[in-house]
Structure formats: structure tokens, C-alpha cells
UniProtKB/Swiss-Prot annotation:
Enzyme Commission (EC) number: 2.7.11.1
Protein name: Serine/threonine-protein kinase sid1
InterPro entries cross-referenced by the UniProt entry: Kinase-like_dom_sf, Prot_kinase_dom, Protein_kinase_ATP_BS, STE20/SPS1-PAK
Subcellular location: Cytoplasm, Cytoskeleton, Microtubule organizing center, Spindle pole body
Recorded name of the encoding gene: sid1
Function: Has a role in the septation initiation network (SIN) required for cytokinesis.
Domain Protein kinase: 9-260
Lineage: Eukaryota, Fungi, Dikarya, Ascomycota, Taphrinomycotina
Domain of life: Eukaryota
Record-stated family: Belongs to the protein kinase superfamily. STE Ser/Thr protein kinase family. STE20 subfamily.
SUPFAM superfamilies in the record: Protein kinase-like (PK-like)
Catalytic activity, as annotated: L-seryl-[protein] + ATP = O-phospho-L-seryl-[protein] + ADP + H(+); L-threonyl-[protein] + ATP = O-phospho-L-threonyl-[protein] + ADP + H(+)
Keywords: ATP-binding, Cell cycle, Cell division, Cytoplasm, Cytoskeleton, Kinase, Mitosis, Nucleotide-binding, Serine/threonine-protein kinase, Transferase
Major place of residence: cytoplasm
């Protein structure tokens, strides 16, 4: 048990950052043990307390050698500290920076991830964000562990969350995008996409605009590996990527698949992890915090610049191109293209949205810019986001009124609109809370869980101290 106070730790190096805060490599001062510490700003994250609480709950209730170990949490000032196991090998996404992985390495990693998923699914827990960036490695033991439970769900007490639009678009199961009730099989789909990601260096459709990906996944046939991969590997992927979630193999069943049964030991991947002179990756590759799915909207605010960032630090505004270095012979599938019709007959506002969805480039719309400039500097980003979401919703509604849309186009738009509304459902209340005086004192009047009450009480104490000092 590690001490639960900030003075007991020395922060050594930033490992990653995301929507909630920062992850540090840290040393416990007495024992000298190296751990990872996730710091979350409770002032900026107060509206997301449910997600923060969910991660703490999930981690504290896991006891598996293939899941990152949780050591405890405490509040210091306005910051929540979550103490976790540190993995010195970084992430699989970091490993992919040096090239695509061969099937031997992939089978080992997949087997270890399946052990973790089999454990979670046995407790009716869904991870909901399986991808290479959330699979961490140990360079000393070769151990492989699942991390980042910020969007995980407990099926037994979170039925409503099974309809929630969460995760990362490229790895999302069709039923998640379509907002139908989903379960453990959603993780299996993401695992299949991750298998392709490790084989090709990038996930399927990685060069497409994320909005376009959301359209395509439910409407298209599942991705497949090229024929030059082994039949057993291709069959494994197909067992994961069935459009019907009921037809996907379970984690327990996949552990018996020939591709997994033939995998070597975790020690076989250590040589890759210890080649520091080749700079396979460093601590900065351990990105255990990722932007949430709401950041899919970022391309509407900033231009997309392909190829200038790594997929591990994905924020839905850049994408990593395939590395030419190959650790095993593989090839990258060509992008599929969505055709469009009657563009010139559509109103300019509709053509703007269509261009955004159907292309890999996006620029800010004047409506968003003009409205955001009217707000104060404190609320500028929120106002801009509010304006853009309002604009997108009204534009989609206008597009649906166009009688020249084909049945397929109309179905795609309706599916997208439903998903978008889900993303936007809490925006209005958050906007009102941000501009209402003392909103945080009224934000959580409903009954709080023990963790939520602890954080809220600590916040009130610090607020009172601040008022006393200023008074």
C-alpha cells in the first residue's frame, strides 16, 4: 500500500496527457518504487465526475495480471491523484512507430489482451476502448496489460451506459455507432481492428475523416487482412469482425483459436522492447490518457493535417500514415471512397457539411467563428462548440429535407444524426452550468457515491480556504 499524500512522491517525467489530465512517471520517496500517477484537475473536470469515478471504480475492482494494477487515489488541492502500475515498455502504439509487427509478436500480444478481456468479461465489465495505445508493455518481463478505463462500463449497474456513444471511431463496433444496445462483443470487434492495426501499422480507414468513418463502419463489410497473411491469422480477425455481435467469438473462445494457441511466450517480445539504441519507443509512448469521442468534432474547428502526428496521440485532427518499415511482410489496404451525387444542387451550407464528411479536409465555418467571438474569453471555447453543434444539427435536418437524396444517403444521414444527438445531449445543461454563478455548488444536488462525495467535499474545503485567504 502506497501513502496517499502528494509529498510522498517525486514526479519524474510526463508520460502522456488527455481530456482529463496528465500521467506522470513518479517515484515513491521511501521505497524508491516507480509508479504511474494520473493527475486530474477537478475544477475543469467537475462535469465529467461520472467518468472519473467510473475509472477509479473499475481499476479498484480489478485483480488480473493482464490489467494495470491500481494502488489508490487521493485529492491534493484541486487535483485528484490516481496511483497505478508503471509499464516501462510503453504502449503497443509506441512499438508500431518503428514498423508493423510480425504475426508471431501479434499472436502473443493478442493472447495476453484476451486474458485481460476474459477476466473483465467474466465480471460483466466492458472496456469499450481497446486499441494499441491502451495496451501497455513491460520491457523487463514482456508482460502485456490493458489500461485506460475512462469509458469502461459495468453491465450489471450501467444499462443506460450501454447505449452511450463512447470509444474511438476507428475501433468502434457498428452497434456502438448505431446506438443499439451493446455488450461484451463490442470489445471483440475493437480487438479485431487492433489486430489489423498491429499488422498494417494503422487501423482500417485511418486516412479518412473521422465523421466519414462513423458513416462507413455500420454500412460496410467488415475489414479483412490481405491474402498474404496466414490463413489462421485472417480467420482469427474474421471471428472478431462479424457485423452481427451475436456471431462474434467470445474472449474465452478466441483463446482456443489456432492462431492464439500457437503463440509463443511473452519473453519472446522482450528483444523488441530492449532495443533502446534503435529507439523503438520511450516513456512518452505510454499514453494512457486519450481524448474522448467528443473530440471527433475537433476537425470542424481546425484543419486536418495528415501525417504530422502519431496515431497514439490521436485527437481526431491528425492521422499517422503507414510506416514503410516492416517487421514482417504486410501491406496497407487502399482507402475506400464514398461517392456523392448532385453536389451542385445542394445549398451552400449543406455542401459545406457534405464536403466535411466526404473529404479528409475541414475548415472552420464562419457561423461558429462569429458566435464564439461574442462570448467572453472564459467561455469562448464552449460557446464556439455550442454554436458549431447547433449549426451541424440544423444543417443535417436541412439535408434530410432534400428529396434528391438516395435511400442509402438518407439512411446514413439519419444514423449519423442519431449518433450526433447522443454526443450533444448534455451540452445545453453544461453551457448553463458554466455561465451560472456558483454553478458547482448546485451541480451535484443528487445523491453522490462515496468517491464523488469525497471529491466534492474536498473541493468545498479548498474553496473555503481560498475565500478566507482572499478575504
Amino acid at each position: 500500500m502506497y501513502p496517499l499524500n502528494a509529498n510522498s512522491y517525486t514526479l519524474l517525467r510526463k508520460l502522456g496527457s488527455g481530456s482529463f489530465g496528465v500521467v506522470w512517471k513518479a517515484r515513491e520517496n521511501v521505497s524508491g518504487d516507480i509508479i504511474a500517477i494520473k493527475q486530474i484537475d477537478l475544477e475543469t473536470g467537475i462535469d465529467d465526475i461520472t467518468d472519473i469515478e467510473q475509472e477509479v471504480f473499475m481499476l479498484s475492482n480489478c485483480n488480473s495480471s493482464n490489467v494495470i494494477q491500481y494502488y489508490g487515489c487521493f485529492v491534493d488541492g484541486y487535483t485528484l491523484w490516481i496511483l497505478m502500475e508503471h509499464m516501462d515498455g510503453g504502449s503497443v502504439s509506441g512499438l508500431l512507430k518503428m514498423g508493423r509487427l510480425n504475426e508471431q509478436v501479434i499472436s502473443i500480444i493478442l493472447r495476453e489482451v484476451l486474458y485481460g478481456l476474459n477476466y473483465l468479461h467474466g465480471q460483466n465489465k466492458i472496456h469499450r476502448d481497446i486499441k494499441a495505445a491502451n495496451i501497455l508493455l513491460s520491457s523487463s518481463t514482456g508482460n502485456v496489460k490493458l489500461a485506460d478505463f475512462g469509458v469502461a462500463a459495468q453491465l450489471s449497474n450501467a444499462a443506460s451506459r450501454r447505449h452511450t456513444f463512447v470509444g474511438t471511431p476507428f475501433w468502434m463496433a457498428p452497434e456502438v455507432i448505431q446506438q443499439t444496445s451493446y455488450g461484451l462483443a463490442a470489445d471483440i470487434w475493437s480487438l479485431g481492428i487492433t489486430a489489423i492495426e498491429m499488422a498494417n501499422g494503422i487501423p482500417p480507414r485511418a486516412t479518412m475523416h473521422p465523421m466519414r468513418v462513423i458513416f462507413e463502419i455500420p454500412q460496410s463489410e467488415p475489414p479483412k487482412l490481405d491474402d498474404h497473411f496466414s490463413p489462421t491469422f485472417r480467420d482469427f480477425v474474421s471471428c472478431c469482425l462479424d457485423l452481427n455481435p451475436n456471431m462474434r467469438w467470445s474472449a474465452k473462445e478466441l483463446l482456443q483459436h489456432p492462431f492464439i494457441k500457437s503463440a509463443g511466450t511473452v519473453k519472446d517480445i522482450i528483444p523488441l522492447l530492449v532495443q533502446k539504441e534503435n529507439k523503438l519507443f520511450d516513456d512518452s509512448d505510454q499514453s494512457v490518457l486519450e481524448e474522448t469521442i467528443n473530440n471527433t468534432l475537433k476537425p470542424f474547428e481546425e484543419p486536418i493535417a495528415e501525417g504530422n502526428a502519431d496515431i497514439e496521440d490521436w485527437t481526431f485532427e491528425t492521422v499517422k500514415k503507414s510506416d514503410s518499415t516492416v517487421l514482417g511482410n504486410t501491406s496497407i489496404p487502399k482507402n475506400s471512397i464514398i461517392s456523392s451525387q448532385n453536389k451542385e444542387e445542394l445549398p451552400s451550407s449543406i455542401k459545406y457539411l457534405e464536403k466535411t464528411i466526404m473529404s479528409d479536409q475541414a475548415t472552420p465555418h464562419p457561423f461558429s467563428k462569429s458566435l464564439s467571438e461574442k462570448g467572453s474569453s472564459y467561455h469562448k471555447s464552449l460557446t464556439s462548440d455550442f454554436a458549431m453543434k447547433h449549426y451541424i444539427k440544423s444543417t443535417i435536418r436541412s439535408m434530410l429535407l432534400n428529396d434528391k437524396l438516395s435511400a442509402t444517403q438518407r439512411s446514413s444521414l439519419e444514423s449519423f444524426y442519431t449518433s450526433f444527438i447522443s454526443l450533444d445531449k448534455n451540452l445545453s445543461s453544461k453551457f448553463v452550468n458554466q455561465i451560472t454563478p456558483d454553478n458547482r455548488l448546485h451541480h451535484k444536488k443528487q445523491k453522490r457515491s462515496p468517491i464523488s462525495q469525497l471529491l466534492f467535499s474536498r473541493w468545498l474545503e479548498e474553496t473555503e480556504k481560498r475565500r478566507s485567504l482572499n478575504g
